[in-house]
Design a protein with these regions (language model features):
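N-terminal beta1-alpha1 cap of cysteine-dependent amidohydrolase-like domains
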Residues: 1-105, 117, 127-155, 171-177, ...
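Short, surface-exposed beta-strand/loop micro-motifs that present aromatic residues
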Residues: 187-193
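Active-site glycine-centered loops adjacent to acidic/histidine catalytic or metal-binding residues
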Residues: 108, 166, 202
């Protein structure tokens, strides 16, 4: 099984000069390689059609960059940093994979990008949704799982405890998507439309192999 994975971009400093680098967090690599998945990084918009042809699914990883509000018709909050625009790369990947009906999984920033790509909007800043420590056992709040959703198949439960590492969230849901999870304070934390799935938390940090295994079995086989 082959899964394309969005590599993220960040700045780093060398000799007082800012440089860009692309990276993948090891959490994703550890979880998915254990399940026999070959990960193919998407590093640019060039030759993306070949990656789509070769791969069985797309994973949109979490990342450090906020989505420019222009993409969902709002003015930027002056208190929020908008440094690197990754949206065109992600949008092209989502457009190409969805066009050929291959499954897509969006995590954290990935769920937000999916929502905006398909016509939704975001809250630019929300309080109390960011844990300071990243461990497999750290959770922050409960989410309610909607019955008959993919997530309910995964967890066989009406609620679960999840971690939280975000300060933006879905506001207006994209047309034709359904909500699959809602946080205890009322924010959308899971969405789905057919074989397009998004979650706001980080199952890879929680080492939730069952989540990824269910996605693979449900949509990639």
């Amino acid at each position: 099984m082959k899964m394309a994975i969005i590599a993220r971009t960040r700045y780093y400093e060398i000799n007082n000069n800012l440089k860009k680098e692309m990276f993948l967090k090891n959490y994703y690599i550890e979880c998915l390689t254990k399940l026999g998945v070959l990960l193919i990084p998407i590093l640019s918009e060039n030759n993306m059609e070949q990656i789509v042809d070769y791969c069985d699914a797309l994973l949109i990883t979490g990342g450090p960059n906020n989505i420019y509000p222009d993409y969902y018709g709002e003015q930027p909050d002056p208190n929020i940093e908008y440094k690197i625009d990754e949206f065109p790369l992600v949008k092209k990947a989502v457009t190409l994979f969805s066009k050929v009906k291959k499954p897509i999984l969006g995590i954290c920033a990935g769920i937000q990008e999916l929502n905006v790509i398909f016509g939704g909007t975001l809250y630019q800043n929300i309080p109390n949704h960011y844990l300071t420590q990243k461990t497999s056992t750290n959770t922050m709040h409960t989410v309610r799982i909607e019955k008959k959703s993919f997530l309910h198949k995964v967890y066989q439960s009406d609620s679960i405890n999840v971690n939280s590492y975000h300060h933006q969230a879905i506001k207006d849901l994209a047309p034709n998507f359904s909500v699959s999870a809602i946080s205890s304070d009322g924010y959308i934390e899971g969405i789905e439309k057919g074989n397009i799935i998004g979650v706001q938390w980080h199952p890879e940090i929680m080492k939730d192999l069952n989540f990824f295994k269910k996605f693979i079995n449900e949509y990639m086989k």
